[in-house]
Amino acid sequence: MKLFYVDESGDTIPLSQGGKKFLVLTGSIIDETNFLPIEKKLRAIKQKYYNDPDIEFKSNFIRNANPDIPDGKSPLKLHDRQKYNELETDLTDFLKSIEVTNISIVIDKAEFWKKYPSQNPYDTAYVFLLERFNLYLQEVGCLGMVIIDPREGRVEKAFVGDHLRDIH
């Protein structure tokens, strides 16, 4: 079975209200047999640098952990440049070692809302993403499971639960 982890970048907020220009929905596909080894390696990195295998890694946290960014706020902040370089190297090597297929859908929200003013770009991106995941599954002859990041950032996800049943 293939696991398809879906997360977004951007938001569904109108540009006139300070929203981002693009909404990007990306899914990363891994084989289920690789899940535990991936988790084990990542937890080891977290333990090595933060003595906490459960600490949350987010790209913003890691980027702002850089001691050369004094205004960068991060629960992962490192004050030693050498240590940060080692973290970057370990994370880069870790990410390069993962067998993954990524699928991304990018929506230019201004153009999208010109054509579909009453539609939610997240819904459209999600449908397109699932279509491509289904094509991938057919191509490799496998079943799959979709895992959506449940945290709400700047994308309204409160409606997603009931709405996804309609999409599937």
What are these model-derived regions, one by one?
Residues 1-168:
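Phosphate-ester processing/binding pockets and catalytic centers
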